[in-house]
């Protein structure tokens, strides 16, 4: 296929048009008075959202060069979302500001490679300063504030804070659709580990690509199963009971896996195989945890047990198991509560004894899985459209809260980014490197400008006053008042703010150093297709 090539200024200008189209669509959602964006869906009702990354992913432009520019900024939103789970709109606003400001200087003859150095240096200083002004999150109220700011809903803030209190900061929190109008919290005892199904043919819900087993038996072993004969006796006993089975083993492969899949597709019985979590000694400990939770036994040669002679009484039970491509969640295991409590105490004792941070972290993960349970946020709404929008906001709020617990919080509303300007200004840079630093300095003001603009105010006036205010004081766009942001509960997770800045700087630097852009030439359709000429159907006369 023939290619279209653009160079230097022409290339960058074409890509900038794409950047602007995407960023302008995303940035209208920023702040407490940000608007929504409606996304067309080919099937079902349209999606109304204010989630930056969801909007960015939907945008596909006709012009190939513009589309490349748009995709670069979509990458900023996507990467920020992957790492911090929120802050995608802020990241997009920062990236657009850096790219536009940088392009002015490159057009004026500045060296983009030296500008890049300045951008990287300024970003590094800004990130370090953010860490210094970050405050650890304390108590249920602080958690509720972070979630409420992210979701723009105080009620959601309270529910997420309660969920994290009930299952712990490391606990598993899932989001489901509710049948009613209200959003409520349900805490279910259970355990989740990061291993998915051995074959996608095992799924029972093809829309969500997950396998759901109701009241299954759970076979737990540290052996590799490649021959179906090894597990046939116990499988026959399970089939007689008419129940599904979850098989947790070192691996299930070859003939054994094929037999399980074929029987599932034929509807003979429902079995899902997953690999055992962890490695080495940690794997044995986690299998033992699962066995205690489900009331089963680990079938291992270490204890003189053999798969061929395994009995249905050695299998665990659970009220429900959900297996996705990457995770398995066991809900309401049938284990005895006193045995579970004893295991929890044993892990707590190990946490006290261990000196390794890594071991301590892994033990705490195991503890959360055994003792924490699974919190289910059931999202309610009047219509399907509202439901989708609320679900997205709650997902963002949950990610934001987790990020806050991890790295602390800073003043929200773009205030923290303006507060680090002083530190960035003190960088001793010269020439085009200083230009790079100035690009970041100008971009740091942009989120505040945009929040003010979305609230119908002049951004420059707000920014100038904010620079004169003491650190932590900022503008509450929801009420139009100047307040202590942290005391007013207007906070952002440090991790979200940091990730947004780092990813915006990274993509902007790449954009400015682009000198040629290559795209496929659009194909010209000749003749317009359609049916071939039938010659007036005259050739059918001989059939009479």
Swiss-Prot record:
Task: Give the record's keywords alphabetically.
Answer: ATP-binding, Chaperone, Cytoplasm, Isomerase, Nucleotide-binding, Stress response
Q: Provide the induction entry.
A: By heat shock.
E.C. code: 5.6.1.7
Query: Can you name this protein?
Result: Chaperonin GroEL
Organism whose genome encodes this protein:
Halalkalibacterium halodurans (strain ATCC BAA-125 / DSM 18197 / FERM 7344 / JCM 9153 / C-125) (Bacillus halodurans)
Q: What is the gene called?
A: groEL
- Primary residence: cytoplasm
Per the record, the domain of life is Bacteria
Reaction(s) catalysed by this chain, per the record, are:
ATP + H2O + a folded polypeptide = ADP + phosphate + an unfolded polypeptide
The GO biological-process annotations, alphabetized, read as: protein refolding
Q: Which family does it belong to?
A: Belongs to the chaperonin (HSP60) family.
Pfam families named in the record:
Cpn60_TCP1
What exactly does this protein do? Together with its co-chaperonin GroES, plays an essential role in assisting protein folding. The GroEL-GroES system forms a nano-cage that allows encapsulation of the non-native substrate proteins and provides a physical environment optimized to promote and accelerate protein folding.
Q: Where in the cell is it found?
A: Cytoplasm
Recorded GO MF terms: ATP binding; ATP-dependent protein folding chaperone; isomerase activity; unfolded protein binding
Q: Which NCBIfam families match?
A: GroEL, PRK00013.1, PRK12849.1, PRK12850.1, PRK12851.1
Q: Signal sequence: where?
A: none
Record GO cellular component, one term: cytoplasm
Subunit arrangement?
Forms a cylinder of 14 subunits composed of two heptameric rings stacked back-to-back. Interacts with the co-chaperonin GroES.
Which residues participate in ATP binding? 29-32, 86-90, 413, 476-478, 492
């Amino acid at each position: 296929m023939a290619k279209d090539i653009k160079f230097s200024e022409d290339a960058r200008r074409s890509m900038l048009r794409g950047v602007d189209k995407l960023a302008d669509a995303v940035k209208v959602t920023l702040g407490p008075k940000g608007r929504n964006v409606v996304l067309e869906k080919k099937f079902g009702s349209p999606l109304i959202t204010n989630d930056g990354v969801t909007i960015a992913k939907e945008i596909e432009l006709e012009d190939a060069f513009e589309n490349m520019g748009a995709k670069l900024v979509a990458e900023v939103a996507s990467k920020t979302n992957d790492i911090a789970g929120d802050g995608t709109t802020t990241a997009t606003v920062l990236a657009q500001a850096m790219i536009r400001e940088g392009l002015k200087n490159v057009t004026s003859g500045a060296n983009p490679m030296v500008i890049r150095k300045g951008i990287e240096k300024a970003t590094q200083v800004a990130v370090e300063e953010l860490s210094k002004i970050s405050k650890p999150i304390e108590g249920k109220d602080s958690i509720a504030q972070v979630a409420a700011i992210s979701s723009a809903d105080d009620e959601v803030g309270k529910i997420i804070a309660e969920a994290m209190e009930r299952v712990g900061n490391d606990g598993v929190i899932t989001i489901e659709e509710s049948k009613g109008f209200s959003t409520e919290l349900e805490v279910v005892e259970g355990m989740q580990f990061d291993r998915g199904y051995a074959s996608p043919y095992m799924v029972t819900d093809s829309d969500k690509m997950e396998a759901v087993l109701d009241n299954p038996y759970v076979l737990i072993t540290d052996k590799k199963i490649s021959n179906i004969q090894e597990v046939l006796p116990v499988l026959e006993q399970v089939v007689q009971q008419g129940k599904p089975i979850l098989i947790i083993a070192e691996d299930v492969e070859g003939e054994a896996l094929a037999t399980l899949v074929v029987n599932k597709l034929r509807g003979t019985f429902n079995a899902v195989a997953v690999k055992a979590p962890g490695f080495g000694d940690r794997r044995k400990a986690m299998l033992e945890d699962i066995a205690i939770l489900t009331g089963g036994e680990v079938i291992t040669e270490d204890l003189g047990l053999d798969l061929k002679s395994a009995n249905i009484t050695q299998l665990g039970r659970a009220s429900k198991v959900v297996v996705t491509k990457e995770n398995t969640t066991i809900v309401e295991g049938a284990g005895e509560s006193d045995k579970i409590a004893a295991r929890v105490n044993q892990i707590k004792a190990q946490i006290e004894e261990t000196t390794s941070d890594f071991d301590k972290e892994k033990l705490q993960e195991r503890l959360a899985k055994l003792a924490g349970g699974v919190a289910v946020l059931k999202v309610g709404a009047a219509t399907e459209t509202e439901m989708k929008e609320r679900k997205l906001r709650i997902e963002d709020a949950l990610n934001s809260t987790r990020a806050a617990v991890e790295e602390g919080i800073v003043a929200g509303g773009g205030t923290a980014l303006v507060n680090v300007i002083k530190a960035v200004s003190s960088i001793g840079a010269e020439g085009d490197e200083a230009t790079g630093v100035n690009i970041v300095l100008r971009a740091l003001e942009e989120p505040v400008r945009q929040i003010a603009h979305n609230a119908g105010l002049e951004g420059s006036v707000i920014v100038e006053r904010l620079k004169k205010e003491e650190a932590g004081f900022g503008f509450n766009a929801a009420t139009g008042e100047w307040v202590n942001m942290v005391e007013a509960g207007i906070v952002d997770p440090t991790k979200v703010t940091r990730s947004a800045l780092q990813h915006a700087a990274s993509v902007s630097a790449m954009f400015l150093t682009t000198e040629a852009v290559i795209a496929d030439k659009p194909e010209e359709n000749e003749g317009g297709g359609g049916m071939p000429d039938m010659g007036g159907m005259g050739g059918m006369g001989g059939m009479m």
